[in-house]
Amino acid sequence: GWTVVSDTTYPGYRAIPIDVMHGYGVMSREVVAQMGAEPPTHVFVQAGVGAFAASVAAAFWLAWGERRPRLVVVEPLAADCHLRSAVAGKPVVVTGALDTIMAGLACGEVSPAAWEIVSTAASAFVALDDRYARDAMRRFAEPLHGDPAIVSGETGAAGLAALLAAQRHAPLSEL
């Protein structure tokens, strides 16, 4: 026998992914504890199936309520299931090769349980070309103003990638 442990829900399989999402929430609760009473204004969070983004949204909603930060959901342009789902008002499956260097986000389909949260909690959805992930990884490795370097992969750099893209493109700066 074996057990599937995934962060993606599907019909007949919900309990374990919800537990995984609760596990993801530990990181967000640590952020809340370190931030204290004053929340940040924005949080850029990567999304593959959306389970991590949903856990971040839920933790911040519980901690700060109406004062919670604006949640900007970031995904690769080649696998933009969250953006397309938001536009359609329902989950949309992205098909094709899903070729992106942000391999951990190349899912093409939202998790239904995560979408229940993300579709309500997100302030914006951003789909990025891979070049922004490369730029973000470089910025992490070679930070400005004496900040410590961070070793990050492409998927982990997605949030910073969206922030850098927002600085460069006027429509994104309105996030």
Where in this protein do the model-derived segments appear?
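Short helix-capping segments at alpha-helix termini
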Residues: 62-68
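Active-site nucleophile and cofactor-binding loops and adjacent substrate-binding regions
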Residues: 20, 45-49, 73, 128-129, ...
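Short internal beta-strands
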Residues: 70-76
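Small/polar-residue-rich loop-to-helix segments that shape phosphate-bearing ligand pockets
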Residues: 1-42, 81-127, 133-134
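Short glycine/serine/threonine-rich phosphate/pyrophosphate-binding segments
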Residues: 46-57, 79-83, 154-163
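Active-site-adjacent helical/loop segments in soluble small-molecule enzymes
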Residues: 27, 39, 110-175
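Short glycine/serine- and small hydrophobic-enriched flexible loop segments
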Residues: 33, 58-62, 161-168
